[in-house]
A protein has these predicted regions:
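Acyl-donor (CoA/ACP) binding surface of acyl/acetyltransferases
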Residues: 1-6, 11-15, 50-153
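Solvent-exposed, charged/polar functional surfaces in cytosolic regulatory/catalytic domains
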Residues: 37-38, 99
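A short, well-structured alpha-helix characteristic of acyl/acetyltransferase catalytic modules
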Residues: 1-32, 36
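Short loop/turn motifs at secondary-structure junctions and domain boundaries
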Residues: 40-46
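Intrinsically disordered, low-complexity segments enriched in polar/charged residues with Gly/Pro
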Residues: 38-40, 63-64
Length: 153
């Protein structure tokens, strides 16, 4: 990922989410600013790996990110809405896990934080070997997420 990708990621992935869950315009502007700052810091961090996926026309398809926490990494995958329901998610998740683990052999567990309403995402992670053990967490955005875990060999 490079700095030029930051605004593309926001427009293609986060804007709809922000508009859905945060109705106040000042909140939306603050989230946009925080988004830009977060990515600028994290693209050069050793604790984060961010992968951007494009199609053959160089259109933005998806992003996968990994946050390393000792022997566990949090994984997030975001798919451009125009590429959903076309079979991309499973392939992107699998490919990004492979890339991530090549450089992070000390990681023993992967965690995915998924909104309860996001049935499609839950299926994708379950198909990739993640399990849900009734563990939930309220994250910094104030929303409650179900935690799916995959134990690695």
């Amino acid at each position: 990922m490079k700095e030029d990708d930051i605004e593309i990621i926001y427009k293609n992935l986060h804007l709809d989410f922000v508009n859905k869950y945060f109705k106040n315009e000042k909140q939306q502007q603050k989230i946009h600013k925080n988004h830009n700052e977060w990515y600028k810091i994290h693209i050069s961090s050793f604790d984060y790996s961010i992968y951007v996926f494009e199609d053959e026309k160089n259109d933005f398809v998806a992003m996968a990110s990994y946050e390393v926490l000792t022997d566990t990494a949090k994984v997030k995958i975001y798919l451009n809405k125009y590429f959903r329901n076309k079979g991309y998610s499973q392939k992107i998740l699998s490919e990004s896990i492979g890339k991530f683990l090549q450089d992070n052999k000390e990681v023993k567990y992967l965690q995915a934080y998924i909104l309860e309403e996001n049935i499609a995402s839950k299926k994708i992670f379950e198909n990739a070997g993640f399990n849900y053990n009734n563990e939930k967490e309220i994250c910094n955005d104030g929303l409650e997420y179900q935690i799916f875990i995959k134990k690695l060999q």
